UniProtKB/Swiss-Prot annotation:
It comes from Clostridium botulinum D phage. It catalyses: L-asparaginyl-[protein] + NAD(+) = N(4)-(ADP-D-ribosyl)-L-asparaginyl-[protein] + nicotinamide + H(+). It comes from the Viruses. One of its GO terms (cellular component) is extracellular region. GO terms for molecular function: NAD+-protein mono-ADP-ribosyltransferase activity; nucleotidyltransferase activity. Keywords: Glycosyltransferase, Host-virus interaction, NAD, Nucleotidyltransferase, Secreted, Signal, Transferase. Residues 47-246 form the TR mART core domain. Transmembrane segments: none annotated. This is Mono-ADP-ribosyltransferase C3.
Length: 251
């Protein structure tokens, strides 16, 4: 299909988890932790959209299949308006919602439940852009050189800390079907490999910020960082990560 290519990629599965990372489409500072794990690698194929019209058509077709209830749609719309607040609370409490205001508990429960209906029908590549704080506060002021390129010493330090590690995100993870224009100025691009049948929902049709081709991933998800490399112009770190799944499975 023109505008759509299939990439042969290496999956790395692992056992174990770590600590919180990100969530809105553009990320705010937070602490992150990682540890080494046992690995098992194998090859698979993922679809990567390069044409915006085809990406929208695919996403809209998926959205029509979900059959979300009115309350589930309202919870998603509300989330897109206040993702930072919701995810901030989830990270602060390590995913535990006991003690949250009753309306927020209800919203989180509805969001979690909606993922029972939102699953990807095929292996697919998703994207998100982040600032240096994604790697932790220690990189916030050291990752970029004055000319906008990635500092190689800081990059090697980040690789030593995160490459071939698992990361656990207590909040929801906003991604896009394409490496869209709003990521152009972001120094970190993560390419998520999401396997067929994984919980992931195309929510752009009802997002408060439509046009980002947004795919939402569930909270308390773990992903494995398979690869970290510099872009050809040296201005971005390209991370490839495999989504491992979520520990949240509501009935």
């Amino acid at each position: 299909m023109k505008g759509l290519r299939k990439s042969i990629l290496c999956l790395v599965l692992s056992a174990g988890v770590i600590a919180p990372v990100t969530s809105g489409m553009i990320q705010s500072p937070q602490k992150c932790y990682a540890y080494s794990i046992n690995q098992k690698a194998y090859s698979n194929t993922y679809q990567e959209f390069t044409n915006i019209d085809q990406a929208k058509a695919w996403g809209n077709a998926q959205y029509k299949k979900y059959g979300l209830s009115k309350s589930e749609k309202e919870a998603i719309v509300s989330y897109t308006k206040s993702a930072s607040e919701i995810n901030g609370k989830l990270r602060q409490n390590k995913g535990v919602i006991n003690g949250f205001p009753s309306n927020l508990i209800k919203q989180v429960e509805l969001l979690d439940k909606s993922f029972n209906k939102m699953k990807t029908p095929e292996n697919i590549m998703l994207f998100r852009g982040d600032d240096p704080a994604y790697l932790g506060t220690e990189f916030q002021n050291t990752l970029l050189n004055s000319n906008g390129t990635i500092n190689k010493t800081a990059f090697e330090k980040a690789k030593a800390k995160f490459l071939n590690k698992d990361r656990l995100e207590y909040g929801y993870i906003s991604t896009s079907l394409m490496n869209v224009s709003q990521f152009a100025g972001r120094p970190i691009i993560t390419k998520f490999k999401v396997a067929k049948g994984s919980k992931a929902g195309y929510i752009d049709p009802i997002s408060a910020f439509a046009g980002q081709l947004e795919m939402l991933l569930p909270r308390h998800s773990t992903y494995h960082i398979d690869d970290m490399r510099l872009s050809s112009d040296g201005k971005q770190i390209i991370i490839t990560a495999t989504m491992m799944g979520t520990a949240i499975n509501p009935k």
